[in-house]
Design a protein with these regions (language model features):
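Macrodomain-like recognition of ADP-ribose-binding/processing modules
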Residues: 1-95, 99-162
Length: 162
């Protein structure tokens, strides 16, 4: 094997997740810029965060515009569990999550929010996090897979808190 397969594939002890649903935890990433609304200016006091990286399914197969096939649902659930497991193993009690593939990867947003809710309600994860925030833009954009928009899809499932 060559490339990443040669590194990751031969080192399963470093990446204990299933290969198809694996993820990477990166501790101590320095945040030193402000947000877009502030022109990405430099922060007066940079801070560090831990990052969990798990790839969402790219353009999943769907049984209708807003629902993935059972295989894609199961794969997505496994990926969401990986995100939460990595965060817990690293000792985090607060999360900032994105819409997990509901943008250019075209995952159905309402179903994705429901799948997040389902995983957070599982015994392994229920009440394990002090704070969970979804960083989902309210840009008003809708698509056939996201007829209410990303923000509204997540707000409908989790409620809105500013």
């Amino acid at each position: 094997p060559s490339g990443q397969d040669g590194i990751v594939g031969s080192r399963p002890e470093r990446y204990p997740m299933e290969r198809d649903f694996g993820g990477i935890y990166t501790p101590g990433v320095t945040v030193f810029r402000q947000n877009e609304a502030k022109g990405y200016g430099l922060l007066a006091e940079p801070f560090k965060v831990g990052l969990v990286t798990v790839a969402a399914i790219n353009h999943p197969q769907c049984v209708d515009p807003t629902h993935m096939t059972p295989d894609c649902v199961q794969g997505t659930l496994n990926k969401l569990r990986t995100v939460l497991r990595l965060a817990l193993r690293a000792g985090h009690d607060s999360l900032v999550l994105g819409a997990f593939g509901c943008g250019v990867y075209d995952n159905p947003a309402t179903q994705m929010a429901q799948l997040f809710r389902q995983v957070f309600d599982e015994a392994e994860f229920k009440n394990k996090f002090r704070l969970v925030t979804f960083a989902v833009l309210d840009n008003g954009k809708t698509t056939p897979r996201n007829p209410v928009g990303l923000y509204q899809a997540f707000a409908n499932v989790f409620g809105r808190r500013d």
